[in-house]
Amino acid sequence: MTGLLAFLLIVLEWTRPSLPSPLRPICDLRVLNHFIKEAQDAEAAMKTCREGCTLSESVVVPQTTVDFDVWEKKNASAKAEEVQSGLWLLQQAFNFLRTSVTNAALHSHIDNAVRNLLSVNAVLRSLNIQEFTPQANGAEIEGTWRASSAAELLQVYVNFLRGKARLLLLDAQACQQDVS
């Protein structure tokens, strides 16, 4: 529920008609930490699930490992494209998981994960990070692999938020401005 509240606050701020300037940058990592905590809660719930919580077939997910030397050499748009492709892949994977899982308690975690992915995209928009949606299907996106279980998908989700998404937010130009 708190993820939905955070998302609604972001959307309301973004769509407010009297707002003469773009959404203020959301540089506070506590916002991302909140999404990570909820992802960890979903991962824990999945690990305790015994019935109705399987993935009917493997799904394409982003690689979560980061070679920091390679990451530092990428330009901002390449980093943004990689993270947004990963967020898109995760959203597709969660939508598929939703159709595979019959456990009602897990449905709420899956729905919350999808809302939080949309919220992370809204945070990126607030940082003036150009939106990117992959044109290819998931298998054609570079830097992917297949998750064969729901628990594996949730682990990828947590690691992606903790890794590449966090690095992109830390590097965001809008957050680098001196506030003196």
From Swiss-Prot:
> According to its UniProt entry, what is the function of this protein?
Erythropoietin is the principal hormone involved in the regulation of erythrocyte differentiation and the maintenance of a physiological level of circulating erythrocyte mass.
User: Where does it primarily localize?
Assistant: secreted
Q: Where are the transmembrane segments?
A: none
Origin organism is Tetraodon nigroviridis (Spotted green pufferfish)
The cellular component terms of Gene Ontology attached to this UniProt record, alphabetical and capped at eight, are: extracellular space
Per the record, the GO terms for biological process are: erythrocyte maturation; nucleate erythrocyte development
Cite the InterPro entries for this sequence.
4_helix_cytokine-like_core, EPO_TPO, Erythroptn
Where's it found, cell-wise?
Secreted
- Keyword Cell cycle, does the record have it? no
Specify the taxonomic lineage. Eukaryota, Metazoa, Chordata, Craniata, Vertebrata
- Which GO molecular function entries does the Swiss-Prot or TrEMBL record give? cytokine activity; erythropoietin receptor binding; hormone activity
Q: Does the keyword Phosphoprotein apply?
A: no
Q: Where would I find glycosylation on this chain? A: 75
Here the disulfide bonds are: 27-175, 49-53
Signal peptide from the UniProt entry: 1-20
Q: What is this protein called?
A: Erythropoietin
Q: Per UniProt, which keywords does this protein have? A: Disulfide bond, Erythrocyte maturation, Glycoprotein, Hormone, Secreted, Signal
Q: Which residues form a coiled coil?
A: none
Assigned protein family? Belongs to the EPO/TPO family.
